[in-house]
């Protein structure tokens, strides 16, 4: 009987353990289904723990074999109670075991937790309606003309430094100059030398007369530079100076049209040269007054050997007698008689009577100097012609001067009534005014 009881107990304990394992597997399978992200490794650990519990139960069943057999009814009740307790313990351990998830442990949020979190979230503010953006129309800039800035590049020789800004007060239109140098124009393909000048004029503008510094551009058609010298002269200066351009930081520079400035160009093959000045305006305040005034008295110099100079023909001299106040006048040695000239000045109280004799000597000195200069100029002209090659002679004889004024436009004063062919005392008059 004892052996049978023991075998019966062992079989019951085995069946109970199998039932417990089945229940644990169902719990694990159910947990796996609800959380698809559970790692496979952790599942195997849970199953191993359950199996270990089953082995412990089998070991306990073997120990029961060694114990004395109990009555069947009591033994069955005790075994049932022990199996139920163990099954509940295994179930509790599985439920208590935290389920591993990828990315770390997290607690499953309950409905209550979700409601609490929703209460803590700030109520989003109502966004203001955005105003519809107005599509801006594209702005088109007028393409610059190839020679548009030529008149600005040509330095306005003889203009006072503080008047340069007034010269560019208006956007002057020099398309007539551009057209003459472009294809189809009278100067197209010809080598030219360009310089600027200014002429203060009283012109009508917006219903009123206004003094305006009118720009003009002089173009010399020549195969070589017309001159490399600058003349410095004025009524206030007693002596006229003819000096090299470079002493005044001026020179003939090749002009590059706007359309060619973005690539390398052979400047030596340029057809347009402008008289440029490299003197920086910022350095003028450190310059002496006499040197500064020289820029204002500069005139582009030109010597035409085949045309008698106006100085050679003139019989007048500029008189600036040093007295208080200075006596400034002109004396013509062919038409004026010196004694009558002096008496008239004394009578008009322009000259003190006690300085009459001194004034006479001063005038005679000026006349002698002027006559000497005329003789020297004639001799120099004859010598230059003798030493000149035939090509140079022909170039001088074919040389032409053109003077350009700005065209009328709505934004600029009308200068059509003040145009003049006169350039300066050295160049004389232009062959054509455009």
From Swiss-Prot:
The answer to whether UniProt assigns keyword Iron-sulfur to this entry is no
Bias-annotated ranges (Basic residues): 1-15, 99-110
Keywords, ordered alphabetically: Coiled coil, Nucleus, Stress response
Q: What Gene3D superfamilies does this protein's entry cite?
A: 6.10.250.2770
Question: Ranges of Acidic residues compositional bias?
Answer: 54-82
> Where does motif Nuclear localization signal 1 map?
1-8
Q: Where is the signal peptide?
A: none
Subcellular location(s): the record lists: Nucleus; Nucleus, Nucleolus
Task: Please explain the role this protein plays, according to its UniProt record.
Answer: Essential protein required for basal thermotolerance, especially during heat-induced chromocentre decondensation, thus regulating transcriptional gene silencing (TGS).
Annotated protein name in UniProt: Protein HEAT INTOLERANT 4
This protein's species is Arabidopsis thaliana (Mouse-ear cress)
Q: What does UniProt list as this organism's lineage?
A: Eukaryota, Viridiplantae, Streptophyta, Embryophyta, Tracheophyta
Gene name as annotated: HIT4
């Amino acid at each position: 009987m004892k052996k049978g009881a023991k075998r019966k107990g062992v079989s019951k304990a085995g069946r109970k353990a199998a039932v417990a394992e089945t229940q644990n597997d169902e719990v694990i399978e159910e947990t796996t289904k609800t959380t698809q992200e559970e790692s496979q490794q952790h599942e195997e650990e849970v199953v191993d723990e359950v199996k270990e519990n089953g082995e412990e139960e089998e070991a306990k069943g073997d120990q029961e074999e060694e114990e004395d057999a109990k009555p069947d009814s009591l033994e069955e009740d005790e075994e049932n109670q022990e199996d139920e307790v163990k099954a509940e313990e295994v179930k509790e351990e599985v439920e208590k075991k935290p389920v591993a998830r990828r990315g770390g442990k997290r607690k499953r949020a309950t409905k209550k937790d979700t409601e609490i979190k929703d209460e803590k979230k700030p109520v989003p503010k109502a966004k203001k309606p955005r105003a519809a953006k107005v599509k801006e129309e594209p702005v088109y800039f007028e393409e610059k003309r190839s020679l548009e800035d030529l008149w600005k590049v040509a330095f306005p020789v003889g203009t006072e430094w503080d008047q340069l800004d007034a010269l560019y007060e208006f956007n002057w239109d020099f398309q007539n100059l551009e057209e003459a140098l472009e294809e189809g124009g009278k100067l197209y393909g010809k080598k030219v030398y360009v310089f600027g000048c200014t002429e203060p004029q009283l012109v009508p503008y917006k219903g009123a007369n206004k003094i305006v510094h009118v720009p003009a551009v002089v173009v010399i058609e020549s195969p070589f530079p017309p001159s490399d010298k600058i003349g410095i002269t004025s009524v206030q200066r007693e002596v006229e100076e003819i000096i090299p351009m470079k002493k005044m930081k001026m020179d003939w520079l090749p002009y590059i049209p706007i359309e060619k400035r973005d690539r390398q160009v052979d400047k030596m093959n340029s057809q347009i040269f402008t008289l440029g000045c490299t003197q920086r305006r910022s350095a003028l305040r450190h310059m002496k007054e006499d040197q500064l005034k020289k820029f204002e008295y500069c005139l582009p110099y030109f010597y035409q050997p085949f045309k008698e100079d106006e100085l050679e023909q003139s019989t007048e001299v500029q008189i600036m007698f040093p007295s208080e106040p200075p006596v400034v006048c002109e004396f013509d040695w062919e038409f004026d008689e010196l004694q009558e000239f002096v008496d008239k000045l004394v009578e008009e109280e322009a000259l003190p009577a006690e300085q009459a004799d001194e004034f006479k000597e001063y005038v005679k000195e000026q006349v002698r100097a002027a006559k000497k200069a005329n003789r020297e100029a004639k001799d120099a002209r004859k010598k230059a012609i003798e030493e000149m090659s035939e090509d140079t002679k022909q170039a001088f004889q074919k040389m032409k001067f053109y003077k350009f004024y700005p065209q009328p436009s709505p934004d600029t004063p009308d200068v059509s009534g003040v145009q003049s062919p006169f350039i300066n005392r050295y160049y004389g008059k232009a062959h054509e005014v455009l």
